[in-house]
A protein has these predicted regions:
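A conserved beta-strand element that flanks and buttresses the S-adenosyl-L-methionine
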Residues: 62
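Class I SAM-dependent methyltransferase SAM/SAH-binding core
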Residues: 3, 8-51
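Conserved class I S-adenosyl-L-methionine
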Residues: 93-119
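Short catalytic micro-motifs in class I SAM-dependent methyltransferases
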Residues: 65-66
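A short glycine-rich, Lys/Arg-flanked "PGG" loop and its adjoining helix->strand segment in the class I
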Residues: 76-88
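Conserved Class I S-adenosyl-L-methionine
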Residues: 136-199
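Short alpha-helix
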Residues: 117-131
Length: 199
């Protein structure tokens, strides 16, 4: 059984389900119901802490680019509940953006917000290390090749959390900066840091 916390459109667990055809459909939870959520998974619009209190058991719990939404206390609470929700030899995988030399294309204000968020992630990694103790780290590099038009649309839709609190005016100004700064095809390497814990 697989649980994906902060699943968004559920692209990852949907791809896993397509490839491995698990007996139990993976469950994806998120506080936002995305209109494009994949159909081959079970989606629930619910917060992680509330859901994990049900104490169902899982073989794999994914926590993807979600830790920055938690306070330090709530992150500890989340990790404790996640550990309790694992079957024997179950795994927790925590994915987060690489905090050093991040290559995500940004306009000035977006970069400033992102750096602030990544700094906070560094402090949260220490909490994760202290709580889970026996962990291993891996970096996953994704080569991204995206049209400027599509990337601008993603910014408009506030695809990354560092854009969420910006005003429409700031987004508009940022988009014009992106339009003049980048070529029609934007290429970069997106690096995700993965923290792995086994029960």
């Amino acid at each position: 059984k697989i649980l994906d916390i902060g699943c968004g459109r559920a692209n990852i667990i949907s791809a896993l389900q397509k490839k491995y055809k698990f007996r139990n459909k993976p469950i994806g939870i998120d506080i936002v119901a995305n209109k494009d959520v994949k159909k081959n998974i079970i989606f629930k619009k619910i917060g992680a802490l509330q859901y994990l209190k049900k104490q169902e058991k899982y073989d794999l719990i994914l926590i993807k680019q979600t830790i920055h939404f938690f306070t330090k206390t709530k992150l500890n609470h989340l990790l404790n509940l996640a550990k309790k929700s694992l079957n024997n030899k179950g795994k927790i995988l925590i994915f987060s953006l690489k905090t050093k030399n991040n290559k995500i294309p940004c306009f000035k204000k977006m970069r400033k917000n992102l750096e602030k968020s990544l700094k906070r992630d560094e402090a949260l990694f220490k909490i994760i290390k202290k709580n889970l103790k026996e962990i291993s780290y891996t970096n996953f590099n994704f080569k991204v090749n995206i049209s400027k038009q599509k990337y601008v649309r993603m910014i408009r839709e506030r695809y990354i959390s560092c854009l969420l609190n910006m005003s429409n005016e700031e987004i508009k100004f940022g988009i014009s900066e992106i339009k003049s700064k980048y070529k029609n095809q934007i290429k970069f390497t997106d690096t995700l840091k993965c923290i792995s814990y086994r029960k």
